[in-house]
């Protein structure tokens, strides 16, 4: 039930601002568009459809959950860029979601139709022959029914707890005495398969929940089933993780308690596979504490993860043409992995570009450092990790070899908390010193410092990355990783770790840009430098490649730079609260978004023209949470060859007119047509990595 809220003063909304939540929905629509893109291999389009749904689930859990919590506050809370109230935002989100649901359904039906010529069909019961129906009834009786537990809601059996994102069959039952009851049957079960193949028709499948729904009469023989549907709820995940630092408990125990609380938070959305009468919907809403406006009817399966089973079938039937061409990240030509890496890195900086180049080079460096007698310590910040992490294995080995290993494991990495808790235990048991994050700030930086004892004193090798230390996602996300023996960078990295060990943040830095105290101000200063250059009659230039732009202070400074005549180019994959190309405000700002085979995740900052350029790679987007509420690190790229490489990469992305979409002055995204032959930046980067690796290999063999 919504509380009566006090009104707050409205503000003037700048014409160049876009609401964060609506901008994110536009990003997810671009993901959905790839599912409908005939230029993408058919089986891969299934993946985009599943990613779209997974993204939307998390969006509702986190963002809509937060807004719904705000709606319960005593005072109206307004978003600081467009002045929308929490309620106005939720209303707009719901309408946009309903529109996108229609688009998703049309694309899904198109995909299923296009799969049929390749021998793949997903059907429901009414498309089966009588013989097939009997076969599936036998299958249901033997393989599914024994594992189902029906719940008829009554005084003796209250409405059951429904798990987040699990599928349930719901039915309205009429007893012989004329009483109406509600039945709930869990359909998500690891005991039986979800994707059931029809034995008489190769490549034809049915979802287990559809089979359960069809055979409900067998489970309720003494009742008449008046109506039935499949149901799925999405639960709020907006927990306050800062409270773990207020507890007397061990931080890990406190986080585990919060995770348990999250599983039982109120739903923020209910999805139904069929229409139900108003009375039953009202009853379900009451039991689940969901308002009716959060109920969605969908023609698409409630959980799209089954598409990966269809892909497995297509792979097994040698339908490789329906997939992306298999690609293996190449080893960087900058390092000879058959020789010791530390001496090579002491001579030159290395920039790894994932997934085009292999994270193996960095893992090899850690493994070497774990064994090298000159290495005295390894310090590292960890946010998200792969299952069976080789990086953790290297740190464990280093500790077991007597080296000092200090690891900050961020326990508050959303939806990775349990994994990080387990890794923190493993690292501690091996003798590593583990820090569980920082009170008041999430540690999101990607920083590794290897300290060596030499004849001249301590010597540092520093690695700064834009993405997580995760072998799996390094093959799926575009990221950059700088490995340098620059001693000044190493000293500043050491200061970051010294502060973290004291539960503090770095107050000032020189080469590194370190949030939350330094990064935003330094970025603003560099934008101002470009404004000053234009005022002096020189050219001003800013190039930014990030995932999201929401920081109002930075947005307003970029607008000021545009008004002064600074040329600004931005590659912003997701949320962009700045609307470019508006006369008098942002006409000198160009924004594109790239959604392609790999998830764009790298961050690049470029300031100044050639003779006075400054270039950085960073873990931080230009979001308030990154610049003000997190520990982030941006590192300068000082090597001239690597600067040129960054320039080439950025310019290639700005010229991408196959996967790159232009954000227009209307706030919508449009196709681009720049080249006679469409240019795909990710394809070019892989081709270059492959070519360089081949040339280097041949040269070494000669």
What do these predicted ranges mean?
Residues 1-542, 560, 564, 576-702:
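N-terminal localization/anchoring segments of enzymes in phospholipid and broader phosphate metabolism
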Residues 567-571:
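Hydrophobic alpha/beta core scaffold segments
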Residues 552-559:
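Glycine/threonine-rich ATP-lid/beta-loop region of ATP-binding domains
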């Amino acid at each position: 039930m919504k509380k009566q809220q006090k009104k707050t003063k409205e503000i003037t909304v700048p014409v160049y601002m876009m609401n964060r939540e609506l901008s994110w929905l536009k990003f997810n629509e671009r993901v959905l568009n790839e599912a409908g893109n005939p230029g993408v291999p058919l089986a891969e389009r299934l993946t985009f459809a599943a990613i779209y749904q997974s993204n939307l689930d998390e969006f509702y859990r986190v963002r809509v959950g937060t807004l719904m919590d705000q709606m319960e506050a005593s005072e109206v809370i307004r978003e600081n860029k467009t002045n929308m109230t929490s309620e106005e935002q939720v209303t707009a989100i719901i309408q946009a979601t309903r529109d996108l649901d229609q688009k998703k359904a049309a694309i899904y039906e198109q995909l299923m139709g296009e799969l049929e010529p390749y021998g793949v069909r997903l059907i429901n019961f009414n498309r089966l022959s009588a013989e097939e129906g009997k076969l599936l009834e036998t299958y249901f009786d033997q393989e599914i029914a024994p594992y189902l537990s029906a719940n008829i809601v009554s005084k003796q059996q209250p409405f059951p707890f429904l798990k987040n994102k699990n599928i349930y069959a719901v039915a309205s039952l009429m007893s012989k005495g004329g009483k109406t009851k509600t039945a709930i049957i869990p359909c998500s079960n690891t005991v039986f398969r979800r994707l059931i193949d029809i034995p008489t028709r190769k490549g034809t499948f049915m979802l287990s929940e559809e089979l359960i729904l069809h055979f409900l009469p067998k489970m309720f023989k003494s009742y008449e089933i008046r109506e039935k549907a499949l149901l799925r709820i999405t639960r709020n995940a907006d927990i306050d993780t800062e409270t773990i630092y207020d507890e007397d408990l061990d931080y890990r125990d406190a986080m585990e308690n919060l995770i348990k609380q999250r599983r039982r938070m109120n739903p923020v959305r209910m999805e139904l596979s069929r229409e139900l009468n108003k009375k039953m919907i009202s009853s379900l809403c009451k039991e689940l504490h969901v308002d009716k406006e959060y109920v969605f009817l969908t023609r698409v399966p409630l959980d799209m993860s089954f598409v990966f089973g269809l892909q497995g079938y297509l792979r097994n039937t040698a339908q490789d043409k329906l997939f992306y061409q298999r690609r293996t990240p190449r080893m960087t030509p900058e390092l000879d992995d058959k020789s010791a890496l530390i001496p090579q890195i002491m001579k030159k900086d290395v920039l790894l570009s994932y997934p085009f180049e292999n994270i193996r080079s960095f893992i090899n460096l850690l493994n070497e450092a774990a064994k090298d007698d000159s290495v005295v310590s390894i310090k590292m910040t960890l946010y998200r990790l792969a299952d069976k992490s080789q990086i953790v294995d290297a740190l464990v080995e280093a500790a077991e070899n007597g080296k000092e290993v200090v690891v900050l494991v961020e326990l508050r990495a959303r939806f990775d908390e349990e994994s990080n808790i387990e890794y923190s235990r493993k690292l501690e048991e091996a003798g590593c010193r583990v820090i569980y994050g920082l009170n008041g700030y999430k540690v999101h930086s990607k920083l590794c410092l290897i300290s060596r004892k030499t004849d001249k004193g301590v010597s540092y090798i520093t690695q700064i990355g834009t993405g997580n230390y995760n072998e799996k996602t390094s093959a799926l996300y575009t990221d950059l990783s700088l490995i340098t023996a620059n001693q000044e960078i190493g000293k500043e990295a050491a200061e970051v770790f010294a502060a973290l060990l004291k539960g503090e943040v770095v107050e000032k830095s020189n080469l590194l840009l370190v949030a939350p105290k330094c990064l935003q101000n330094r970025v603003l200063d560099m934008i101002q430098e470009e404004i000053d250059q234009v005022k002096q009659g020189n050219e001003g230039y800013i190039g930014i490649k990030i995932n999201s732009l929401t920081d109002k202070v930075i947005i307003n400074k970029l607008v000021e730079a545009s008004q002064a005549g600074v040329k600004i180019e931005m590659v912003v994959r997701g949320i962009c609260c700045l609307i470019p190309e508006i006369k008098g405000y942002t006409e000198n700002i160009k924004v594109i978004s790239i959604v392609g085979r790999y998830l764009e995740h790298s961050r690049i900052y470029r300031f100044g023209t050639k003779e006075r350029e400054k270039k950085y790679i960073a873990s931080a987007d230009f979001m308030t949470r990154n610049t003000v509420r997190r520990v982030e690190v941006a590192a300068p790229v000082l090597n001239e060859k690597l600067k040129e490489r960054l320039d080439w990469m950025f310019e290639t992305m700005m010229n991408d007119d196959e996967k790159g979409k232009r954000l227009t002055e209307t706030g919508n995204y449009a196709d681009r047509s720049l080249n006679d032959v469409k240019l795909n930046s990710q394809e070019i980067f892989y081709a270059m990595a492959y070519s360089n690796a081949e040339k280097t290999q041949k040269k070494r063999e000669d």
